[in-house]
Amino acid sequence: MNEQQIILKNKDNKLKKTYSEVLITSFKGKNNSSSILLNNICANLTDKLELTNSFITSEKELKQKIDKNKYKYIISFGQKPNCNKLYIELFGNKNNDRIETSFPYKKLISFMKGNNIEYVISKNAGNYLCNNIYYEGMKYIKDNSLDIKMIFIHIPTKNKEFNFREIVKIISNYIESLVDENCWSYGIISNQ
Protein backbone atom coordinates (compact mmCIF):
# COMPACT_ATOMS: atom_id res chain seq x y z
CA MET A 1 0.00 0.00 0.00
CA ASN A 2 1.21 3.51 -0.68
CA GLU A 3 2.25 5.66 2.25
CA GLN A 4 -0.45 8.20 1.51
CA GLN A 5 -3.86 6.92 2.51
CA ILE A 6 -7.17 8.45 3.37
CA ILE A 7 -7.81 8.81 7.07
CA LEU A 8 -11.45 8.95 8.07
CA LYS A 9 -12.41 10.20 11.50
CA ASN A 10 -15.75 9.90 13.20
CA LYS A 11 -17.60 12.76 14.90
CA ASP A 12 -15.49 12.29 18.06
CA ASN A 13 -12.38 12.82 15.90
CA LYS A 14 -11.25 9.23 16.46
CA LEU A 15 -9.65 7.23 13.69
CA LYS A 16 -12.23 5.16 11.83
CA LYS A 17 -10.39 3.60 8.94
CA THR A 18 -7.44 4.10 6.64
CA TYR A 19 -7.60 2.86 3.06
CA SER A 20 -6.63 3.46 -0.53
CA GLU A 21 -9.23 4.74 -2.95
CA VAL A 22 -8.09 3.25 -6.23
CA LEU A 23 -6.70 -0.11 -7.28
CA ILE A 24 -4.68 -0.09 -10.49
CA THR A 25 -3.96 -3.41 -12.19
CA SER A 26 -1.88 -4.62 -15.10
CA PHE A 27 -0.52 -7.92 -16.32
CA LYS A 28 2.98 -9.09 -15.48
CA GLY A 29 5.71 -9.06 -18.07
CA LYS A 30 9.06 -7.35 -18.40
CA ASN A 31 8.11 -5.89 -21.79
CA ASN A 32 4.37 -5.64 -21.18
CA SER A 33 3.40 -1.99 -21.65
CA SER A 34 0.60 -2.28 -19.07
CA SER A 35 3.11 -3.44 -16.45
CA ILE A 36 5.52 -0.65 -17.36
CA LEU A 37 2.67 1.88 -17.12
CA LEU A 38 1.54 0.52 -13.73
CA ASN A 39 5.04 0.74 -12.30
CA ASN A 40 5.45 4.33 -13.50
CA ILE A 41 2.10 5.74 -12.38
CA CYS A 42 2.56 8.09 -9.47
CA ALA A 43 -0.73 8.84 -7.74
CA ASN A 44 -1.69 9.14 -4.11
CA LEU A 45 -4.17 6.81 -2.42
CA THR A 46 -3.66 3.96 -4.86
CA ASP A 47 -2.76 0.31 -4.61
CA LYS A 48 -1.12 -1.50 -7.49
CA LEU A 49 -1.51 -5.13 -8.49
CA GLU A 50 0.34 -6.95 -11.25
CA LEU A 51 -1.77 -9.89 -12.31
CA THR A 52 -0.41 -13.27 -13.31
CA ASN A 53 -0.90 -14.15 -16.98
CA SER A 54 -3.36 -16.92 -16.17
CA PHE A 55 -7.16 -16.88 -16.32
CA ILE A 56 -7.73 -18.62 -12.98
CA THR A 57 -4.81 -17.13 -11.05
CA SER A 58 -5.47 -13.54 -12.14
CA GLU A 59 -9.14 -13.86 -11.11
CA LYS A 60 -8.11 -15.13 -7.66
CA GLU A 61 -5.53 -12.37 -7.25
CA LEU A 62 -8.05 -9.64 -8.09
CA LYS A 63 -10.80 -11.06 -5.87
CA GLN A 64 -8.42 -11.43 -2.92
CA LYS A 65 -7.26 -7.84 -3.32
CA ILE A 66 -10.86 -6.60 -3.49
CA ASP A 67 -11.77 -8.59 -0.37
CA LYS A 68 -8.90 -7.09 1.65
CA ASN A 69 -9.64 -3.44 0.82
CA LYS A 70 -12.43 -0.94 0.33
CA TYR A 71 -11.77 0.55 -3.08
CA LYS A 72 -13.98 3.06 -4.81
CA TYR A 73 -12.43 2.46 -8.23
CA ILE A 74 -10.50 -0.20 -10.09
CA ILE A 75 -8.63 0.84 -13.22
CA SER A 76 -7.20 -2.11 -15.11
CA PHE A 77 -4.71 -1.86 -17.94
CA GLY A 78 -3.77 -4.33 -20.63
CA GLN A 79 -1.55 -4.22 -23.68
CA LYS A 80 -3.11 -3.93 -27.15
CA PRO A 81 -0.66 -4.53 -29.98
CA ASN A 82 -0.84 -2.77 -33.35
CA CYS A 83 -2.49 0.42 -32.13
CA ASN A 84 -1.39 3.93 -31.18
CA LYS A 85 -4.39 4.99 -29.10
CA LEU A 86 -5.93 4.16 -25.76
CA TYR A 87 -8.97 1.89 -25.93
CA ILE A 88 -11.52 2.58 -23.21
CA GLU A 89 -13.44 -0.65 -22.83
CA LEU A 90 -17.13 -0.38 -21.91
CA PHE A 91 -18.04 -4.08 -21.68
CA GLY A 92 -16.70 -7.35 -20.37
CA ASN A 93 -18.08 -10.44 -22.13
CA LYS A 94 -18.18 -14.13 -21.33
CA ASN A 95 -20.17 -16.71 -23.24
CA ASN A 96 -23.48 -14.93 -23.87
CA ASP A 97 -23.24 -12.65 -20.84
CA ARG A 98 -22.20 -9.02 -21.16
CA ILE A 99 -21.56 -6.61 -18.29
CA GLU A 100 -21.34 -2.87 -18.84
CA THR A 101 -19.02 -0.75 -16.73
CA SER A 102 -20.51 1.54 -14.08
CA PHE A 103 -17.30 3.59 -14.05
CA PRO A 104 -17.86 7.33 -14.74
CA TYR A 105 -16.01 7.02 -18.04
CA LYS A 106 -17.41 10.24 -19.49
CA LYS A 107 -15.20 12.14 -17.03
CA LEU A 108 -12.26 10.02 -18.21
CA ILE A 109 -13.09 10.87 -21.83
CA SER A 110 -13.31 14.55 -20.98
CA PHE A 111 -9.92 14.32 -19.25
CA MET A 112 -8.42 12.61 -22.31
CA LYS A 113 -9.86 15.23 -24.67
CA GLY A 114 -8.61 18.04 -22.45
CA ASN A 115 -5.11 16.58 -22.64
CA ASN A 116 -5.20 15.85 -26.40
CA ILE A 117 -4.94 12.09 -25.90
CA GLU A 118 -6.27 9.97 -28.74
CA TYR A 119 -8.63 7.24 -27.62
CA VAL A 120 -11.26 4.86 -28.91
CA ILE A 121 -14.45 3.91 -27.10
CA SER A 122 -14.57 0.14 -27.48
CA LYS A 123 -17.36 -2.34 -26.88
CA ASN A 124 -15.13 -5.36 -27.36
CA ALA A 125 -12.33 -6.00 -24.85
CA GLY A 126 -11.25 -9.05 -26.83
CA ASN A 127 -11.47 -12.69 -25.80
CA TYR A 128 -8.33 -13.30 -23.80
CA LEU A 129 -6.91 -12.31 -20.39
CA CYS A 130 -7.92 -8.63 -20.55
CA ASN A 131 -11.57 -9.32 -21.26
CA ASN A 132 -11.61 -12.17 -18.73
CA ILE A 133 -10.29 -10.09 -15.83
CA TYR A 134 -12.63 -7.25 -16.75
CA TYR A 135 -15.69 -9.47 -16.94
CA GLU A 136 -14.82 -11.48 -13.82
CA GLY A 137 -13.96 -8.34 -11.85
CA MET A 138 -17.26 -6.63 -12.70
CA LYS A 139 -19.20 -9.86 -12.08
CA TYR A 140 -17.59 -10.26 -8.64
CA ILE A 141 -18.41 -6.64 -7.79
CA LYS A 142 -22.01 -7.10 -8.95
CA ASP A 143 -22.53 -10.50 -7.28
CA ASN A 144 -21.25 -9.15 -3.95
CA SER A 145 -23.11 -5.82 -4.19
CA LEU A 146 -19.89 -3.85 -3.82
CA ASP A 147 -19.78 -0.12 -4.44
CA ILE A 148 -16.76 -0.27 -6.75
CA LYS A 149 -16.57 1.16 -10.25
CA MET A 150 -14.26 -0.70 -12.65
CA ILE A 151 -12.87 0.26 -16.05
CA PHE A 152 -10.46 -1.47 -18.41
CA ILE A 153 -8.12 0.52 -20.63
CA HIS A 154 -6.06 -1.05 -23.38
CA ILE A 155 -2.79 0.72 -24.10
CA PRO A 156 -0.43 0.34 -27.06
CA THR A 157 2.81 -1.54 -26.86
CA LYS A 158 5.70 0.76 -26.03
CA ASN A 159 6.84 2.21 -29.36
CA LYS A 160 8.34 5.35 -30.86
CA GLU A 161 5.01 6.62 -32.20
CA PHE A 162 3.23 6.52 -28.83
CA ASN A 163 4.18 9.10 -26.20
CA PHE A 164 4.35 6.72 -23.26
CA ARG A 165 5.83 9.23 -20.81
CA GLU A 166 2.95 11.65 -21.48
CA ILE A 167 0.36 8.91 -20.91
CA VAL A 168 1.96 8.01 -17.57
CA LYS A 169 1.73 11.64 -16.49
CA ILE A 170 -1.84 12.14 -17.68
CA ILE A 171 -3.15 8.89 -16.17
CA SER A 172 -1.42 9.74 -12.88
CA ASN A 173 -3.12 13.15 -12.92
CA TYR A 174 -6.48 11.60 -13.78
CA ILE A 175 -6.25 9.19 -10.83
CA GLU A 176 -5.30 12.10 -8.56
CA SER A 177 -8.40 13.98 -9.74
CA LEU A 178 -10.59 10.95 -8.95
CA VAL A 179 -9.14 10.71 -5.46
CA ASP A 180 -9.42 14.45 -4.82
CA GLU A 181 -13.06 14.40 -5.90
CA ASN A 182 -13.83 11.57 -3.48
CA CYS A 183 -11.96 13.16 -0.59
CA TRP A 184 -14.46 16.00 -0.70
CA SER A 185 -17.47 13.72 -0.99
CA TYR A 186 -16.31 11.63 1.97
CA GLY A 187 -15.63 14.64 4.17
CA ILE A 188 -12.01 13.68 4.68
CA ILE A 189 -10.38 15.43 7.59
CA SER A 190 -6.71 14.84 6.86
CA ASN A 191 -4.19 13.06 4.69
CA GLN A 192 -1.27 11.27 6.30
Task: List each model region and its residues.
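Short active-site-adjacent structural elements
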Residues: N159-N163
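N-terminal catalytic or cofactor-binding beta/alpha core of small enzyme domains
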Residues: M1-Y128, M138-K149, R165-S172, E176-Q192
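An accessory alpha-helical subdomain
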Residues: H154-K158
